[in-house]
């Protein structure tokens, strides 16, 4: 189960970084 824990932690870290960048810098692209 260690692999699952590592994947979960890495996913949470990536999501946190993504939201930090998204909220710090408004997206420049339009849908």
UniProtKB/Swiss-Prot annotation:
InterPro entries: PSII_PsbT (IPR001743), PSII_PsbT_sf (IPR037268). The keyword Cell membrane does not apply. It is a single-pass membrane protein. The chain crosses the membrane at residues 3-23. Keywords: Membrane, Photosynthesis, Photosystem II, Thylakoid, Transmembrane, Transmembrane helix. It is found in: Cellular thylakoid membrane. One of its GO terms (cellular component) is plasma membrane-derived thylakoid membrane. PSII is composed of 1 copy each of membrane proteins PsbA, PsbB, PsbC, PsbD, PsbE, PsbF, PsbH, PsbI, PsbJ, PsbK, PsbL, PsbM, PsbT, PsbX, PsbY, Psb30/Ycf12, peripheral proteins PsbO, CyanoQ (PsbQ), PsbU, PsbV and a large number of cofactors. It forms dimeric complexes. NCBIfam families: PRK11875.1. Found at the monomer-monomer interface of the photosystem II (PS II) dimer, plays a role in assembly and dimerization of PSII. PSII is a light-driven water plastoquinone oxidoreductase, using light energy to abstract electrons from H(2)O, generating a proton gradient subsequently used for ATP formation. Belongs to the PsbT family. This is Photosystem II reaction center protein T. It comes from Prochlorococcus marinus (strain NATL2A).
